[in-house]
């Protein structure tokens, strides 16, 4: 984990709380039942009291996924999203919209992430020159693939020398069809009020954002799911490779993504198991607590290379050094 290679600004907890409306995940829904259209903005306090809602937060036992859930009993809909990671794909935001009501509905979805950091932005720069930094930001999206690239026009410097920013942050969507793309948060209020919004292909001098808009019908007892996938430290070769995969293998990428996440989970379990972190008992909470403790110990101190086997020569040298 590095504050110098983050997807969002690396802030203290109080700033994260204060900026929850303009940083990170943001979803807005226009839901139509018959002739009535309802505006629903999950996890926002803008329309507090308008609906009978229930909110939950979950984390899996091994700590690789965190899931946020808002149940709207008034509309008969549940929206969930989870943050997970993948060695190959980066940060994965997976969303689900579930209709548990008795009637079908038509949903217009606007989903995305805000205040994305381009690459080559240090935490010191973000915390000291955040407003100046915005002027250097450039966002663009390839409409054919939906792949967005967020970069700096140049690295901030007060010296008379060229300093190119050759790395970027990328975001793409998987699982949605007939999608419009937007690159700034300025379209949010227009969407809330039902006004038309124009697809954006390039934005300069503004905080980076990635939004997708689409419409679909959701029958009673059915659900839709999709992914927003972001990664940092991407060079031109990686971006070209990702673009080609989106063109030729888009449908297969979802299965590859889920398989990759499962492989990462298995690898983490194997690492923790090598430090005796796996146990089974009648107390599930105690078992989960033990796993977490061992995992954090491993993060601090590492694991043995070959279980409890060591080289005789190394052991003799260690004993000699400590006792001479």
Predicted feature residues:
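Anionic coordination/interaction segments
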Residues: 1-324
